[in-house]
Amino acid sequence: MPGTQKRRAAASPLRAIPVPKEENYVTASLTNAGQDSATKSNIYALAAGTKRGEFSTSKQRERMRALIESLDNPTKDPAVHPTLIGTWELLYESSGFPFRSSPFFWAVGKLLGEQADFFYSAHDHQTSIFGGGVGACLQRIGTGTLESDCVVQASLGVPPIGFSPIFAGYGSVITKGTTRTVDGDTIGMTLASLSTTVRQDDASVLPALNFLNGTTVPVGEVMNRITDGSSEVKMRITYLDDELRISELEDGTKLVYRRVEE
C-alpha cells in the first residue's frame, strides 16, 4: 500500500548505521541447523548495519560473502519450488546499489557490460541528490512472472546556501516481465518482456507532474532495438527457505531478501 511504502522510505535516511562489533555476532552451535540459524542472524545484523550494503567496507563485504557461502540451501530446485512464490523485500545488495534489485538494471548491466558501474554510480548520485534516495525494494514473484517495486524519494533544495529541501515526494518505479525456468536453481527473463511503470505516490506535491502517474514505458521494446530481443537476464537462487532468499546475478552480485506480507 502507498502509505506503507511512504513509511518505509521515510525511515531509511541515507546515513551510516553502527555496525555490530565482531564479538557481538552470534556464535553458531555445532549442529547444521544451529549453524544456519546463527549465520542468518549474522546476515541480518550485517545487512542492517551497512544499510543494505550501501555503506559496507571491503572487509564487511567479504564477511557477508563468507556468511552467504556458508549456508546450506535446504530447498532442492528452488527455481521451481512453491516457496519461491510471494513478496520479498531486499535486505542487502553486494555492490552497494539497492536499485539493482530491479530486472531493469539487470538488463542495463547486460547491455553496458564493463561500463555498467559508471551508469549505476550516476543513477545513485541522481537519486540521492538533495536528500533523496531509494526506499524499500520489493520483488513479487509469481508463476512465470516477476515484478520489482522500488520506492524512490525525490527532493529539491538549494544546496549553495544551505536550505533544507523545498519539497520531498515519494513514488515507485515498477518493472515487471515474464520468467522461465532455466534450470533447477535459475530463472530467466527475456529483455523484450520488460515494462516499467512510474507511480507518483505523493501526487499533491507536484501536481504538474501528475500526468506521469501510471505511465508505463515499454523498455523491452527499446532494448529489442538495441540487442537481440530473445536475449535474457538470469537470476540464480542459491538459498531459499520460508523466510530468507539469496540470489545471484550473472555478474556475481549477491542479493539477500526476506519474505514479507503485504
What are these regions (language model features)?
Residues 1-30:
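N-terminal chloroplast transit peptides
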Residues 19-262:
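Soluble ligand-binding/transfer domains with enclosed cavities or grooves
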